[in-house]
UniProtKB/Swiss-Prot annotation:
Keywords, in A-Z order: Cell outer membrane, Lipoprotein, Membrane, Palmitate, Signal
Bilayer topology: Lipid-anchor
Coiled coil: none
Subcellular location: Cell outer membrane
SUPFAM superfamilies named among the record's database cross-references: OmpA-like
Protein name: Peptidoglycan-associated lipoprotein
Stored InterPro entries: Bact_OuterMem_StrucFunc, OMP_bac, OmpA-like, OMPA-like_CS, OmpA-like_sf, Pal
Primary site of residence: membrane
Organism whose genome encodes this protein: Buchnera aphidicola subsp. Baizongia pistaciae (strain Bp)
Amino-acid biosynthesis among keywords: no
Family affiliation: Belongs to the Pal lipoprotein family.
Length: 173
């Protein structure tokens, strides 16, 4: 008898607890969180982006190639907001040129194991891909690859060298 009463009380309380817990706002995520960044950037108007036409395809592609490298902090795969304009322009270009394909390479510095660096390099490439897809780019246009620490652009054991190697590079195919 007592257990039936407890069960009834719990049956009544559980939906109330669930309702109240869902009605309170969740804690805001760190502004460096990649999901928050994607959400904020996706909400921006596409009208702000440059309009690309067939007339200036080569010229536009050359401009985009100049901003083809995204750098990352140590042990991090989140795209920094300072790359938003370049990535937004690239997304707009790819949306207007659906036959254009890109490959995103993920790279790391030499610190860490080979296995971890391959994983982190892939996460970096995937973060850039996810950002572009959030802007409407087809996943059929993007491939990713991780090179880990195997293709450094700077050699040395100082932060100056390390920071140049923590990157994703966009290759136009």
């Amino acid at each position: 008898m007592k257990s039936k009463k407890i069960f009834k009380i719990l049956t009544l309380l559980l939906p109330m607890i669930t309702t109240f817990s869902c009605s309170f706002p969740k804690n805001k995520l760190n502004s460096n969180n990649v999901d928050t960044f994607y959400e904020q950037e996706t909400n921006k108007s596409k009208q702000q982006l440059t309009n690309f036409s067939e007339d200036n395809f080569d010229e536009t592609l050359e401009k985009l190639k100049k901003g083809n490298t995204i750098y990352f902090p140590f042990n991090n795969h989140q795209v920094n907001s300072k790359y938003a304009k370049n990535l937004n322009d690239l997304a707009q270009f790819l949306c207007h040129h659906s036959n254009q394909k890109i490959m995103i390479e993920g790279h790391t510095d030499s610190r860490g194991t080979n296995k971890y660096n391959m994983y982190l390099g892939q996460k970096r490439a995937d973060s850039v891909k996810l950002y572009l897809e959030s802007k409407g780019v087809s996943n059929q246009q993007i491939t990713t690859v991780s090179y880990g620490s195997s293709k450094p652009v700077a050699h040395g054991n100082k932060e100056n060298s390390y920071s140049k190697n923590r990157r994703s590079v966009i290759i136009y195919q």
